[in-house]
């Protein structure tokens, strides 16, 4: 079968068609990159500023940290995760950054300056000082299905955590996200453990 040669007009139309296809593919790629960027920022780039010393030495006053809001949509918080929690039902309620110590269904007790989970001592890797004030955990606090027990890292100088009766246990709906990165100051840039 013999090919019929294309006229100049047909060649030009073919060239324009190929150019439009290349531009379309390029624009589609650009849109995908933008969508992924928005997804990443909305999921992993939510920032909050630390306004006290309650998480010292892990986090310090005026550290800017990033939250991962997506991690708990596909999984559950784990012991020792550092999380941002909203204390109260209102959108205007204060947000705190705390460390998860107790998980749903466990009993948390603080006695003789140490944390016990279901009668087994929990080693606190962020501070080895004895806890001076057990608060509501002195007699043991059994957590419900969606409840977590949170603690300040600087627990002897701050008590605005689950030991305080007015705060108590944290419901999973109050957890805004996992704190994963110190963004600034640059001298403290790094992952949060």
Model-found features: residue ranges?
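Aromatic-capped interface at the extracytoplasmic side
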Residues: 35-55
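Hydrophobic membrane-insertion alpha-helices, especially the h-region
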Residues: 22-42
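Soluble "head" domains of membrane/secretory-pathway proteins
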Residues: 2-22, 57, 61-193
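Short, functional N-terminal and low-complexity linear motifs
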Residues: 25-32, 48-52, 142-147
């Amino acid at each position: 079968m013999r090919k019929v040669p294309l006229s100049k007009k047909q060649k030009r139309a073919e060239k324009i068609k190929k150019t439009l296809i290349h531009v379309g593919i390029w624009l589609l790629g650009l849109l995908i990159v933008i969508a992924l960027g928005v997804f990443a920022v909305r999921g992993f780039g939510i920032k909050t500023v630390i306004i006290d010393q309650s998480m010292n030495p892990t986090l310090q006053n005026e550290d800017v940290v990033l939250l991962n809001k997506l991690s708990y949509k596909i999984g559950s918080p784990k012991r020792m995760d550092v999380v941002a929690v909203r204390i109260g039902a209102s959108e205007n309620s204060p947000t705190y950054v705390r460390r998860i110590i107790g998980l749903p269904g466990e009993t948390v007790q603080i006695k003789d300056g140490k944390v016990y989970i279901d009668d087994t001592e929990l080693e606190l890797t962020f501070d080895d000082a004895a806890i001076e004030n057990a608060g509501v955990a002195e007699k043991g606090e059994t957590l419900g299905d969606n409840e977590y027990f949170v603690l300040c890292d600087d627990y002897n100088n701050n008590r605005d955590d689950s030991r305080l009766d007015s705060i108590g246990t944290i419901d999973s709906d109050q957890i805004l996200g996992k704190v994963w990165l110190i963004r600034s100051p640059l001298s403290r840039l790094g992952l949060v453990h």
